[in-house]
């Protein structure tokens, strides 16, 4: 688990460096990180850990190990910077499996997936900061009642719309709107918005709706394959 958090911290740190130094997107931080990881060694190690857990009848450990293996496989994605929506879904399913274990299953996750968009393309690891925010700044701060996260992957005309909604603490709408324009510590949503807009144009990006004690909704929009704004 610590290795997982360290990897995500390193990814987020390197994304910041990319924007500061104006490095081309195709050469951004994941290339450097992937060069340090031997996928075969990683997968073989996780496979061995899974076998040892099953042999010891530690099925919870086996479940987390398999989720971690899926997370790394979909995150590294054979060095590709652009992946399918299906890859993103698998990555988030594994990520949330790990988070649920870490949180003693004290929240639930609902999915709404349009199967017709699974082969559409998108930048990899685009959604992880959004879901992480829903957990850390949403449901983790909610003291009472059921804690829920909802993820939707839908087609909308020529676009793909991904929605992440939590029923956590929420925030004033004015603050929510600043998260996509200013680099707020611990959120990372500006980087997500910038990546989408640089790749696809200013008509795309993320929108946040929130209110105190009513949760937060983040909607991410990008074009289906082959479509983008004219520059």
PLM feature spans:
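Two-component histidine phosphotransfer core
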Residues: 1-37, 41-209, 215-221
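Generic C-terminal helix-cap and adjacent flexible tail
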Residues: 224-231
């Amino acid at each position: 688990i610590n290795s997982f958090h360290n990897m995500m911290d390193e990814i987020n740190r390197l994304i910041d460096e990319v924007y500061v130094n104006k490095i081309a997107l195709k050469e951004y931080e994941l290339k450097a990180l992937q060069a340090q990881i031997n996928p075969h060694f990683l997968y073989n190690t996780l496979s061995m850990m899974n076998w040892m857990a099953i042999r010891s009848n530690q099925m919870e450990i086996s479940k987390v190990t398999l989720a971690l293996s899926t997370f790394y496989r979909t995150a590294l994605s054979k060095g590709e910077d652009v992946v399918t929506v299906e890859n993103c879904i698998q990555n988030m399913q594994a990520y949330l499996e790990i988070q649920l274990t870490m949180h003693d299953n004290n929240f639930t996750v609902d999915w709404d997936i349009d199967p017709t968009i699974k082969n559409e393309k998108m930048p990899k690891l685009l959604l992880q900061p959004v879901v992480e925010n829903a957990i850390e700044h949403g449901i983790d701060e909610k003291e009472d009642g059921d804690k829920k996260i909802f993820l939707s992957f839908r087609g909308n005309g020529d676009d793909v719309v991904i929605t992440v909604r939590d029923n956590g603490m929420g925030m004033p709408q004015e603050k929510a709107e600043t998260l996509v324009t200013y680099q707020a510590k611990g959120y990372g949503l500006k980087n997500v918005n910038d990546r989408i807009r640089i790749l696809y144009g200013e008509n795309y990006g993320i929108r946040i709706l929130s209110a105190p004690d009513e949760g937060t909704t983040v909607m991410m929009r990008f074009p289906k394959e082959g479509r983008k704004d004219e520059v």
